[in-house]
Amino acid sequence: MARTKQTARKSTGGKAPRKQLASKAARKSAPVSGGVKKPHRYKPGTVALREIRRFQKSTELLIRKLPFQRLVREIAQDFKSDLRFQSSAIGALQEAVEAYLVGLFEDTNLCAIHAKRVTIQKKDMQLARRLRGERS
């Protein structure tokens, strides 16, 4: 017989609810106005973990193409005006930039974990870059 996954369900039977104090009952019944339902919220970190799994599976570029292209052209203006770029050149630049950033964030996360934290900070990124030899 195959095993099936058990899901949590609300119980219908069981013990009868205990009587509450008058002040507790008044507090609970007072704010009910029109039965407005709160929107569903996930626990902190749940959505972040889901996004991490989704982006680790994907292979598409994460930075939008046109804003990246404008940034490349703006930076290139400082070196030489009227430069032209093939679309494949900008695509190659974007691939390289995203690969670099992903690697940097991985190293930054390792620095934060080493410091017994789960949140990356500016000093983690500075340490990661210094260990890579990019910055003195």
UniProtKB/Swiss-Prot annotation:
Sites bearing N6-methyllysine, chain numbering: K5, K10, K19, K24, K28, K37, K80
Modified positions (Phosphoserine) in chain numbering: S11
Cellular location(s): Nucleus; Chromosome
Sites bearing N6,N6,N6-trimethyllysine, chain numbering: K5, K28, K37, K80
Record-linked InterPro entries: Histone-fold, Histone_H2A/H2B/H3, Histone_H3/CENP-A
Cellular component GO terms, alphabetical: nucleosome; nucleus
GO biological process: rRNA transcription
Modification N6-acetyllysine, positions: K10, K15, K19, K24, K28, K37, K57, K65
Cited CDD domains: HFD_H3
Chain intervals for the UniProt region annotation (Disordered): 1-42
Main location: nucleus
Summary of subunit composition and partner proteins: The nucleosome is a histone octamer containing two molecules each of H2A, H2B, H3 and H4 assembled in one H3-H4 heterotetramer and two H2A-H2B heterodimers. The octamer wraps approximately 147 bp of DNA.
Chain's role: Core component of nucleosome. Nucleosomes wrap and compact DNA into chromatin, limiting DNA accessibility to the cellular machineries which require DNA as a template. Histones thereby play a central role in transcription regulation, DNA repair, DNA replication and chromosomal stability. DNA accessibility is regulated via a complex set of post-translational modifications of histones, also called histone code, and nucleosome remodeling.
Name of this protein: Histone H3.3
Lineage per the UniProt record: Eukaryota, Fungi, Dikarya, Ascomycota, Saccharomycotina
